[in-house]
Amino acid sequence: MGKQPLAKKAEIVDKVRSLLQASQMVLVIDYKGLTVAEMDQLRAELRKSDSVCMVVKNTLMRRAIADQKAWAGIIPFLAGPTAFILIRGDISAALKAYQDFAKQTKKTEFRGAGIEGLSLTLEQAKAIAELPPKEVLMAQVAGSLKSVATGLAVGLNAVPTQVARGIHEIPASLGRAIRAIADKEAA
């Protein structure tokens, strides 16, 4: 394979950068042994989850992520024949599509993943994929905060009620005590 002109390499790096900026996670896989038809099949499956599979030279990927701390986690995996799955949409759907493809072909190997500057193993990537979407997590937090606020309001409302009951009880108790003393003296 001949050397690519510098302008072509810069164009590839720019394209990869723009795809990375739109991505939530990057999976790094070894594609050695996959046919063109199999790569096309993987790409088609990944498109369903708004993900892209691309083969980029490791040196060009290093250039693309050089100034992006969010993708520093994939640097240890940049060796040998490497394909990158850039996940822009549903992480769990993309991961499942890749795993199903890997089981079917038995020709690809998961090297690792990167997210927010971290390197992830397959198990860690699966754990992240199983998290509910951001909107659901935010709703759960909001619901928890609402229940805490409601409990606090009910508790604070109960304090004056208890004080009022106590104040009301003092004269009644005093009246019962005076009546008991009077009954004792009368007897």
From Swiss-Prot:
Transcription regulation found in the keyword field: no
Gene3D superfamilies: 3.30.70.1730, 6.10.250.290
Signal peptide extent: none
Gene Ontology CC terms, in alphabetical order: large ribosomal subunit
Domain of life: Bacteria
Alphabetic keyword roster: Ribonucleoprotein, Ribosomal protein, RNA-binding, rRNA-binding
SUPFAM superfamilies, alphabetized: Ribosomal protein L10-like
Purpose of the protein: Forms part of the ribosomal stalk, playing a central role in the interaction of the ribosome with GTP-bound translation factors.
NCBIfam families in the cross-refs: PRK00099.1-1
Protein name: Large ribosomal subunit protein uL10
